Structures are given as structure tokens and as C-alpha cells.
Amino acid sequence: MTELFYDDDADLSIIQGRTVAVIGYGSQGHAHALSLRDSGVDVRVGLAEGSQSRAKAEAEGLRVLNVAEAVAEADVIMVLTPDQVQRHVYAESIAANLQAGDALFFGHGFNIRYGYIQPPADVDVALVAPKGPGHIVRREFEAGRGVPDLIAVEQDPSGNAWALALSYAKAIGGTRAGVIKTTFTEETETDLFGEQAVLCGGASQLIQYGFETLTEAGYKPEVAYFEVLHELKLIVDLMVEGGIAKQRWSVSDTAEYGDYVSGPLVIDAHVKDNMKAVLKDIQDGTFAKRFIDDQDAGAPEFKALRAKGEQHPIETTGRELRKLFSWIQNDDDYTEGSVAR
């Protein structure tokens, strides 16, 4: 049975009595650090020398150190750098500065699940993973609400890791919404599967094939874009609000009937078989090895796939159409048409 925890189940004073280092200041890093600070926690940010995020963190009133210094000062270390660099950051700046009784926290279980990071046995190892992007985590915290978190404990030599993880989750707003107990393995494997088979890989490929099908049949690219990409948000928002049932309740009878009779023609049984193959590669480490090996080689496959995706005709059409969308807010960190970060 799924275990859920809320504010009354967590003691904020536990994390308030610790010294926290947040390593990284990206999407999740800024949300964690700022919310911890606002919850009365002694927090500092650890960044690599020359990091472009230093000025942003300092401008928001946070104390910034290099990673080794931040870890040496802290007894709770939350690692929020990208998966592919975590093991390097750990080896170069974290491992030598860990002390017995410290707690090593992660926002995603990848490096623990696949053994790229192997902490010493006298250190607590836990996971606190908000189920939303950092700007939403921070926005909801400031509004007095929260985003649900997943929490897990891999090592608990202190006997206090669960209580500490719950306290940390409370400090970033997670227990306001609800915290679900899981494992590093379950969080990592389901997260990767969701990204690859449905949310990112599956959805992106479905949209591109839909666009190609319509334009190859002679329909205008602009009309195809609206029908297979732009309106997707409307459908997903309904699903988020009330599941697939509310989406079907909200659309026309024609759309609902088409959902039932045509959906299984497009997403048929062989797609589920393909999903099982994707899951197997995640479970046995094939995907993780492919990703890390490519990153270690300079990411040639990753860069080639990214460039290919950017060149798809739907991107050209979308760039022109979005100029008409007065309601879209520009993101200062994003360059239109580019996936590179």
C-alpha cells in the first residue's frame, strides 16, 4: 500500500538544526535553496568555479561557495547537478569532504541506482524528488502550497534518514501537497520510462508523425501544427485536472468517439511491446550505459540527435506561428528554435 505523508508527519526543526549545501543552481537547485532559506534552514549553494549561476544565486541573497567548501561546511548535501556530471562532481569535490554522520541527498536516483556514485557506509543516503519543474516548486511554495514529492532512503546508518528526508521535504513545501514513499530504484526506473516512452520521447514522436501525415497529404503546415501540437496543451491540462475521464467528458461526442475507435489503431498492441523493450533497457542498465558512454565521449550521438530534431519542419512552422501568440511569455534563458542549454 502506498504510504503518504503530510505536514503533521514531518518535523521541520530537524532540518532547521542541520547545515545544508545545495549543489547546483538550475531548475531544482534554485527552488530548493530559496525555499530552504525561507523555511529557516542554514543553507549555502555549491557551484563550480566560473559557474554562470553564481551571480544569480548571490543576487537572490544566497551564500555561494565552491562545491568542496560547501560540502565541508555542511552535514546535509543535496546534489542537484545534471545526471551525467554528478559522478565527476562527487569524485572531485564531494567524496573527500564527507564526514561520518553526514547525509547525502539526491533529487533523482540515477547515479545511485546505476552505481555511478557509491557513498561510504557511514553516510545517510536519501532522495527528495519534487514531481514538478523547479519554477513550479518555488511558485507553489511562495503561494503557501506545495508540489508532491517522492522520498526514499538507500542508506540509514544514523537511523534518522527517513525523518530527515521528511523534514527536508517539508522545508521545500512537499508535505503541504503530500509525500510518497518510494525507493531509488522505483523512482529512477519509472521516471526514465515516463520520459522516454510517454512524456518526451513518445509524445514528441507522435506529434511529429501526426504533422508529417497531414502535411504529406497536402494540408497546410500551419493548420497541421495547430491540430497536432498547439491544442495538445488543452487536452493535457484536462487530464491533469481530472484524468482521462475528464478529458473525454470535456470534448465533443465526435472527439470522444474518435478517441475510442481510432486511438487503438494508432497506439496498438505492438506499441506496448515496444514500451516493454524500453523499460527492459532501463531496468538492466542498457540505457544508462549508452547515455553515460556517449556523454563521456563528448556526446556525439546526443548532439547529432538534437540537431536532427531541431531541423524538423514542425519547428520552422512553429517559430512563425508563435509570433502570433501575444500571450506567450518569453523565457530569457531560452533561444527560440534551439534545444542546446
Swiss-Prot record:
Binding positions for substrate per the UniProt entry: 252
Pfam families in alphabetical order: KARI_C (PF01450), KARI_N (PF07991)
One Gene Ontology cellular component: cytosol
Entry keyword annotation includes Hydrolase: no
Gene Ontology BP annotations: isoleucine biosynthetic process; L-valine biosynthetic process
Transmembrane segments: none
Lineage top rank: taxon: Bacteria
Residues involved in Mg(2+) 1 binding: 191, 195
Key words, A-Z: Amino-acid biosynthesis, Branched-chain amino acid biosynthesis, Magnesium, Metal-binding, NADP, Oxidoreductase
GO MF annotations in UniProt: ketol-acid reductoisomerase activity; magnesium ion binding; NADP binding
Catalysed reactions, semicolon-separated: (2R)-2,3-dihydroxy-3-methylbutanoate + NADP(+) = (2S)-2-acetolactate + NADPH + H(+); (2R,3R)-2,3-dihydroxy-3-methylpentanoate + NADP(+) = (S)-2-ethyl-2-hydroxy-3-oxobutanoate + NADPH + H(+)
Record-listed Mg(2+) 2 binding positions: 191, 227, 231
Pathway in which this enzyme or protein is active: Amino-acid biosynthesis; L-isoleucine biosynthesis; L-isoleucine from 2-oxobutanoate: step 2/4; Amino-acid biosynthesis; L-valine biosynthesis; L-valine from pyruvate: step 2/4
Necessary cofactors: Mg(2+)
Binding of NADP(+), residues: 25-28, 51, 53, 83-86, 134
Catalytic class of the enzyme: oxidoreductase
EC code: 1.1.1.86
Full protein name: Ketol-acid reductoisomerase (NADP(+))
Source species: Renibacterium salmoninarum (strain ATCC 33209 / DSM 20767 / JCM 11484 / NBRC 15589 / NCIMB 2235)
Gene assigned in the entry: ilvC
